[in-house]
Amino acid sequence: MKIGLGLYRESLTPDNFRFARQAGATHIVAHLTNYFRGRDPSLSAGCAKEGWGDCSADELWDYEDFAGLVKTVRDNGLEIAAIENFSPRFWSDVLLDGPDRIKQIEGLKRLIRDAGRAGIPCIGYNFSIAGVWGWSRGPFARGEAMSVGLDLAAIDPDLPLPDGVVWNMRYRAGRPDAEPVTVSSDELWQRLGAFLREVVPVAEEAGVVLAAHPDDPPAEALRGTARLVNRPEKYDRLMDIVDSPSNGLELCLGSLQEMPGTDEIYGHVRRFAQRGRIGYIHFRNVRGKVPNYHETFVDDGDIDMAEIVRILRDEGYDGVIIPDHTPEMSCDAPWHAGKAFALGYMRALMQNAAALGPSRTDQSSSIRIEAR
């Protein structure tokens, strides 16, 4: 197991690379989509009408972008584990089944080939129309640390998606006379299937793993659009669409734990590890489930993170694990302090994985569950 750190575009700086090394990370998961303004990484409420930001001017990333990123990261003593998330502008019509779908699919194929050629082994993505939306921000974590959470009763989950917005970002100007977007579960799965059947063979040739993030929040629907992977067993359905090592998972532990009706996630994590399809892992902890949960410090939620490490150890997982987002601590560098706490906790668990003893969960719980 290897420790990584996720950095947003504006946070891909020498100072943050140095911080990552100091905290024990060896790998970087880079977000090239510019979600936020300003230079400081932070949490996002994800609930404003216009979402996180405007990506309408984004140009498709190419080999030079990726090669420059890989060189910069390596020059700073680290390795690239993955890039995370396509800009919504690159695939809005793939998600919405719009008129530029074929053109955008071809663009994604070029992007995947260029990433593989540059030495980027994995691309994380989230096949979602509403995206990460509905959070609130407040002193929800231990010691009143700032964190994010979901209270579905406090928002209107059916608030229509503004025209020109997908994945919680504006990809073009809106039309005032446009009809609200509505998408059923069957329609969304059909779109995902068409996407995977087109791009996974290209990823195989390029030596790239496409790693799917589950829904966050994992509600049944948001903003008139169905959610996709909002139960752990739906990951199996996704992997079965194209049975390939390049059709993998961006395994977010917090999102799995948030899913309603899921008593425990340990058997699911073991099953996914046994299938050998985990691209990388978001090591995040939470308390509660949809419709009401909040994110916690990594040692203070409903997930036994030591048990997760035992399972990964037993199943031979040797990939990258990152903290994902964390609560912010009360100091002059709240983001860095929160990340440092999570990275230190993770490093201690992983360095002592052999001494953690046997797994405490029934290995038979990894029996596969069919999703329909």
Locations of the language-model features?
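Residue-level "edge-of-site" marker
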Residues: 9, 33, 86, 128, ...
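Histidine-acidic metal/acid-base catalytic patches
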Residues: 2, 11, 16-19, 24, ...
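A short beta-strand-loop structural module common to alpha/beta enzyme folds
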Residues: 26-36
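Short beta-strand and adjacent tight-turn residues that come in two discontinuous sequence segments
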Residues: 30, 125, 322
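Nucleic-acid endo/exonuclease domains
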Residues: 6
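Structural motif corresponding to the early beta-alpha repeats
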Residues: 34-193, 205, 255, 313
